[in-house]
Design a protein with these regions (language model features):
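Secreted/periplasmic proteins
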Residues: 2-98
Length: 98
């Protein structure tokens, strides 16, 4: 049983790592995130890690929510993640996801 869970986890990580995407990113506030490096994505598994790249900067954040539900946007970042990426003043930016 333990081995099959481990193999499933590896396969899930590998599948999510292969899902490169380009599109728009925005950020959202709220007390629910407690200053964490988190994000919302429509399809990636909860708890998976996403690498977000913007203008030479890159961050890793954990998927803990669903969204964004605005056409053209591929990810919503927590305030801390947006600040680390350097996109706070722009609000919405074009990013690459890995």
């Amino acid at each position: 049983m333990g081995r099959s869970v481990w193999v499933s986890a590896i396969l899930m990580f590998a599948a999510s790592a292969c899902q490169a995407e380009d599109g728009l990113a925005s950020y959202y506030g709220g007390r629910a995130h407690h200053g964490e490096m988190t994000c919302a994505h429509r399809t990636r598994p909860f708890g998976s890690m996403v690498v977000v790249r913007y203008r030479g900067h890159s961050i890793s954040c954990r998927v803990n929510d669903r969204g964004p539900f605005i056409q053209g946007r591929v990810i919503d970042l927590s305030v801390r993640a947006a600040r680390a990426l350097g996109m706070m003043s722009a609000g919405v930016v074009r990013v690459s996801l890995e």
